């Protein structure tokens, strides 16, 4: 990325990430669509309550794997094969123990979590069952992410995408057969998700064992090395904390939505699936910006940094125009995929109003993600954490004020408020950074 036009580099790097994001989002949306249409509004609401809690666990796992991936990439680049294998072994052993403990703790604390979130009595039982089963799937999620990080560290970003695609298709097929065809309930929805996660982890392990021997630890390398664990945790801690802030905020907002009733909960679950299709690809473009800036900074090509960042922002805004327009035009049709039968019209009306506002507001996270990508590429991880905490904290506070007064649209305005504050912090700091680095 240190030579040639920035647009080509950024676009080609972001496309596989975007495809992976869309597959993961489709994977999640299929669960919600099938639950809402074949089981009912209560099942859709139950998944909506459980989602933010599980996202907190998943993003913490992702942060740990990102930290390990950085170290594995360094070892691979330095041709230190033994260190590469030992880093992967340390990550897998420590992460497995951590995830098993988190799964057990999550299962034990599920009733307390649901009471803290003020989950309505009508869905308390099924939400608890769904959440406990998905907690048990956390170790499989970790294994897939850790193995995928290993494959990406040696330059293979396509194979993890294939396993993710297989997992998404398997989940959809199992849901359609067992829930849509045979009439099983919410328990089956949770189980099929865990089975699909386990399948992706197993495929990655088998592939690595047979096709990527340079990643496979030997018999004497299966141990936790403290000298490697420290850097893994340090690299991953800031990323994990930053990623965890958003789902914590979402859990707090979910508590405000829960007070609005089952219909609002179901609508919010549906619209957040649409939101994800806006936010997550914008984060992928930000990752491309990060890589571009980091490579050029490392190569001393500071003259390319600001130009590449401007191109990245244009890509972000271009994606917003596409996603915002589609959301505005198709929002009612999209929402009708999630619900059917009694109460569906109310859920669609609530969600449609929310998405009408958000289609415009999606421009704000396009900008904030671009700036976050810039700061990560410049090595300013603390700046990204401060910006995220400002945005999430004020968004949650605004939601607590607005949601009881104006309902679900209040959540949309709270999001916009948080993003505006984040930009008010990041934009001036960007110009200060450019002056300091003479960009």
What name fits each language-model region?
Residues 1-14, 72-137, 181-237, 293-360, ...:
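Short alpha-helical transmembrane segments in multi-pass integral membrane proteins
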Residues 12-31, 133, 144, 167, ...:
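Transmembrane helical elements of multi-pass membrane transporters/channels
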Residues 17, 21, 33, 70, ...:
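Transmembrane alpha-helix boundary and packing residues in multipass membrane permease domains
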Residues 18, 22, 26, 30, ...:
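Generic alpha-helical transmembrane segments of integral inner-membrane proteins
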Residues 26-45, 114-121, 177-184, 244-277, ...:
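Helix-terminus/linker motif at the lipid-water interface of multi-pass membrane proteins
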Residues 44-104, 141-160, 267-331, 365-379, ...:
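Small-residue-rich hydrophobic transmembrane alpha-helices
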Residues 65, 133-152, 160-168, 189-204, ...:
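Short runs within selected transmembrane alpha-helices of multi-pass transporters and secretion channels
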């Amino acid at each position: 990325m240190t030579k040639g036009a920035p647009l080509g580099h950024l676009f080609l790097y972001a496309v596989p990430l975007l495809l992976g994001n869309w597959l993961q989002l489709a994977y999640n949306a299929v669960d919600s669509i099938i639950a809402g249409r074949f089981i009912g509004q209560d099942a859709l609401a139950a998944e909506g309550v459980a989602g933010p809690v599980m996202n907190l666990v998943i993003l913490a796992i992702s942060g740990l794997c990102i930290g390990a991936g950085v170290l594995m990439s360094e070892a691979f680049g330095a041709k230190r094969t033994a260190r590469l294998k030992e880093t992967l072994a340390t990550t897998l052993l420590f992460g497995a123990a951590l995830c098993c403990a988190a799964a057990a703790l999550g299962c034990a604390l599920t009733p307390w979590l649901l009471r803290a979130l003020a989950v309505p009595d009508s869905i308390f039982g099924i939400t608890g069952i769904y959440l406990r089963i998905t907690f048990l799937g956390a170790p499989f999620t970790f294994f897939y992410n850790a193995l995928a990080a290993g494959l990406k560290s040696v330059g293979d970003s396509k194979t993890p995408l294939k396993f993710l695609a297989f997992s998404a298709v398997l989940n959809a097929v199992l849901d359609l057969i067992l829930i849509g065809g045979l009439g099983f309930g919410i328990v089956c929805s949770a189980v099929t998700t865990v089975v699909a996660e386990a399948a992706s982890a197993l495929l990655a392990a088998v592939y690595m064992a047979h096709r990527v021997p340079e990643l496979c630890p030997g018999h004497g390398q299966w141990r936790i090395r403290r000298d490697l664990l420290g850097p893994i945790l340090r690299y991953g801690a800031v990323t994990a904390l930053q990623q965890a802030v958003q789902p914590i905020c979402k859990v707090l907002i979910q508590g405000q939505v829960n007070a609005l009733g089952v219909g609002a909960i179901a609508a919010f679950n549906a619209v957040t699936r649409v939101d994800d299709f806006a936010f997550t690809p914008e984060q992928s473009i930000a990752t491309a910006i990060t890589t571009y800036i980091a490579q050029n900074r490392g190569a001393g090509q500071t003259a390319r940094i600001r130009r590449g960042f401007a191109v990245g922002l244009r890509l972000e805004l271009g994606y917003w125009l596409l996603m915002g327009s589609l959301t505005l035009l198709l929002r009612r049709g999209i929402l009708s995929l999630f619900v059917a039968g009694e109460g569906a019209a109310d859920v669609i009306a609530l969600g449609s109003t929310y998405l009408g506002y958000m289609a415009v507001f999606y421009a704000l996270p396009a900008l904030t993600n671009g700036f976050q990508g810039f700061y990560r590429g410049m090595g300013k991880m603390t700046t990204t954490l401060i910006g995220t905490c400002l945005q999430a904290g004020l968004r949650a506070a605004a939601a607590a004020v607005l949601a009881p007064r104006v309902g679900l649209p209040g959540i949309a305005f709270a999001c916009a408020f948080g993003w505006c504050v984040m930009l008010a912090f990041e934009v001036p700091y960007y110009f200060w950074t450019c002056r300091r680095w003479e960009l």
